[in-house]
Amino acid sequence: MLKIFEKIFGSKHEKDIQKIQPVINRINEIQEGLKGLGDDELKEKGKALKSRIRGVLMPIEDKKKELYRQLDNPELSLEEAESIHSSLDALAEEYEEKTASALEEALPETFALVKETCRRLKGLTYQVMGRDVVWDMVPYDVQLIGGIVLHSGKISEMATGEGKTLVSTLPTFLNALTGRGVHLVTVNDYLAQRDKEWMNPVFDFHNISVGVILNTMRPEERRQQYQCDVTYGTNNEFGFDYLRDNMAGTVEEMVQRDFYFAIVDEVDSVLIDEARTPLIISGPVPNSDNSQFQEIKPWIEQIVRAQQQLAASYLTEAEKALKESPQSPEAGLALLRVKRGQPKNTRFIKILSQQGMAKLIQVTENEYLRDNSSRMHEVDDELYFAVDEKAGTIDLTDKGREFLSKLSHQDRDLFLLPDVGTEVAAIDDDESVIAADKITRKDAVYRLFAERSERLHNISQLLKAYSLFLKDDEYVVQNGQVMIVDEFTGRILPGRRYSDGLHQAIEAKENVKIEGETQTMATVTIQNFFRLYEKLAGMTGTAETEASEFFEIYKLDVVAIPTNRPIVRKDMDDLVYKTRREKYNAIALKVEELQKKGQPVLVGTTSVEVSETLSRMLRARRIAHNVLNAKQNEREAEIVEGAGRPGAVTIATNMAGRGTDIKLGEGVREKGGLYILGSERHESRRIDRQLRGRAGRQGDPGESVFFVSLEDELMRLFGSDRVISVMDRLGHEEGDVIEHSMITKSIERAQKKVEEQNFAIRKRLLEYDDVLNQQREVIYTRRRDGLIKERLTTDILDLLRDYCDSVIDRHSKNLDTEGIEEQLLRELSIEFKPDRNNLEENATGVSEELYNSALAFYRRKEEAVPADIMRQIEKYAVLSVIDKQWRDHLREIDTLREGINLRAYGQKDPLLEYKQEAYNLFIQMLSEIELETLSLAFKLFPVNPDEVRAIEERQRQAAVRQEKLVTQHDDAASVYNASPGAENEAPLQRPVTADSKPGRNDPCPCGSGKKYKNCHGQQP
């Protein structure tokens, strides 16, 4: 029905393009008029455009500067400050409106100027990444359309080879005229550097400064690059600089400007694929101990071997039962136990690909899952540990606990968590025990919980490392380090680590150095970072399949840009085999056939392991080829550029050359163009479209096909039942290949199922992070104010006023004058003796008296301490307290999130529970920030130069405390899975150390998410 309407009325994309066409005509008309100008005259046109736009914006900027200057006045009243803030808000709206209208008016002239500049640069030879390049690019009309779409704050979907990099120069040039800075976001440092050098002649012609942010740069270099009109860089670098700026100790240490306009290249990769991975800056945990991994590792290796032997016996049992009856329930149960015990067993995977086996296992599993999985324990009880591969969880069974108990010669109870609530309640109810002994006994319960919780957590992570994470698939080992491989691109992710001790577990498994545990110091999700920009746009060749997510999360519309020339690539149906062995042999034969023909072939793989397997097979056949994967990525650009030569064979993981064109060599067009051979379907249709898109650029011929087996990961986990039934109906025999549109559609349905699941994870992640994001905005705004303001005395005295009211209000009901004296002496180091009668009759007056007394003390301190030192004391008090409290708050939020899904068992919505408790923690943190800031400002009293230098040194160290950059990978997202059923493990705590009582501000070990002092640490 929808297609009928589109035929009659036109599609959305066609209507979008029709609206833009008159502007394109106007741009080309203006460009014709520019051809007669000399170079200097053309440059003057650019200067005039910039002056015109700046002339509109500068008066508003001057007004804002004046208002900010007024805010620094220490005598300013609260009402006057609020009035100024209202004026600033109004000016911000006016500024945004005038910027938009000025740029809209200048767009045709600016785009024409860029197009004419490109025309004049034709034939220019210059250096890009150390190689000579000749400029031969002038924007086509479709590229002008793409540029307008980007300027409008939308996503421009352009096919491979349509010149997205050149398109970006059009809106970048236009928005750079504002002087506010434009960010071009790419997926890696190489592309950032290359694109900056490649497009620089256009900007350089008009004296528009261009910078690039690279991973190796120092803060001083970064600041210079951000001051440029245009700055290229990766999403990670922009995001980490944002977090680092909000940890800076001085204004001079901050590197970024405001977030005005960002254009994201490969927007689907950055805003979709990376969105499950928060950006995290972390520092080492004091006194962290990784020795337990080495202690536990021998036990885990033995229990894993025992499980493997158990799985082998069940497979033998199943094979015997299947000979007697193809639908044997005994065989179904045995195979289900293998699926729950060792799902990646190669023998099991082969059986799974046989006719009717996947269905038999599913029917058996459904039987045991009835009535809320009430019988699933009958399956799992015979195993040492149960694996849920889809959910990524592992649960130690009673049999496993018994095994570990005998192995370690320790009590079986050591592998069980004590019921803290029940045991503490029993202690409280025991009237024969005095209060002091109750505290001692409770501490013993908490210590026991912490010890066992940490041990069980480490056991669980080691079991995951051995059962679910494969070397050369999820990670590689290089130079004695475990390096995560990006599941979407196949690239190594330097500096990234799995969270919650999983990375340390894999390091123990691989016998490399176990790095220390880290704690979060600052964090932001990709979604919430890019929401900081006033205007956001993106470009990619594959966005349409995720259009709804782009709009729902980022409010970004997707506009498909027509190609300059029609795409003539042939996309063939999938070729489906039963086993991987059959599939790999077929791939090797096809590659050999294509090489003999002289047609270049790009073989796309989903993992390092598969790329190396195929490489070995081709070497055995003496077929010359290049391999591009996470282990061998240094020659990426060179290999990809040569992949279009006659007879070239290139094996590449998904990383293959996004952002690098594969140009066809001489005579290749006549032989059919580049042949894309996918060795496996990826879980995302978009990644498959990207692979196909390597061929057929700019109207070139090309072919693409995917070779699939029923043993592939996607088919095994999500799609094999339906595909096997289709193959059975089509009469498939061992060794046969099936090519049918029904099969291809079934595979795409499986991919859609995974995409929906991943979208749900990303959306859930965002729902949780939105809570923290609102808190982050409050804290970062407070911190930035503390950093930028010259004087913080007014803020300190505002805190003092509230503090005095709070102290008097707290003690006036009981006329507790001693309590007032004690609190003031402890918290502010000041003496004040209130009159008991006044406290009863006029508490407000006593509060005013206290304020005046404290103010007089503070004024005397100001007179005694040099003004510049006093300003440093105030700044240090504000910044150091915010940093410490925010760091502690992030740890508490982590602890809260780890166990929040368990609330679903109590018929409560985990998200609502999380919002409420996170809010309570935040309010409590703000209260503690205010008290500690005030206390530090009053108590810190340097009396000699050494103490002054100590304050300066502490400020400097606070800003530099960024020992390790860590972005937590997939494991970070698992916390947000909505289903409590996916959480088969005991709640993963970040326990207190086993040899000490929890600190008052540490998370309570009971898992409530509250501070110890407000939970089980309360005095009885």
Swiss-Prot record:
- Membrane topology according to the record: Peripheral membrane protein
Q: Where in the cell is it found?
A: Cell inner membrane; Cytoplasm
Assigned EC number: 7.4.2.8
- CC terms in the record's Gene Ontology section: cell envelope Sec protein transport complex; cytosol; plasma membrane
Q: What is its main location?
A: membrane
Keywords carried by this UniProt record: ATP-binding, Cell inner membrane, Cell membrane, Cytoplasm, Membrane, Metal-binding, Nucleotide-binding, Protein transport, Translocase, Translocation, Transport, Zinc
Give the GO biological process terms: intracellular protein transmembrane transport; protein import; protein targeting; protein transport by the Sec complex
Necessary cofactors: Zn(2+)
Give residues annotated as binding Zn(2+): 1004, 1006, 1015-1016
Reaction equation(s) it catalyzes: ATP + H2O + cellular proteinSide 1 = ADP + phosphate + cellular proteinSide 2
Enumerate the Pfam families for this protein: P-loop_SecA, SEC-C, SecA_DEAD, SecA_PP_bind, SecA_SW
What InterPro entries does the annotation carry?
Answer: Helicase_ATP-bd, Helicase_C-like, P-loop_NTPase, SEC_C_motif, SecA, SecA_CS, SecA_DEAD, SecA_motor_DEAD
Q: What are the protein's GO molecular function terms?
A: ATP binding; metal ion binding; protein-exporting ATPase activity
Cofactor: record remark: May bind 1 zinc ion per subunit.
Q: Which PROSITE patterns match?
A: SECA, SECA_MOTOR_DEAD
Location of the region described as Disordered in the Swiss-Prot/TrEMBL record:
974-1020
Binding residues for ATP, per the UniProt record?
A: 143, 161-165, 661
Q: How does it assemble?
A: Monomer and homodimer. Part of the essential Sec protein translocation apparatus which comprises SecA, SecYEG and auxiliary proteins SecDF. Other proteins may also be involved.
Biological function: Part of the Sec protein translocase complex. Interacts with the SecYEG preprotein conducting channel. Has a central role in coupling the hydrolysis of ATP to the transfer of proteins into and across the cell membrane, serving as an ATP-driven molecular motor driving the stepwise translocation of polypeptide chains across the membrane.
Its family remark reads: Belongs to the SecA family.
Could you tell me what this protein is called? Protein translocase subunit SecA
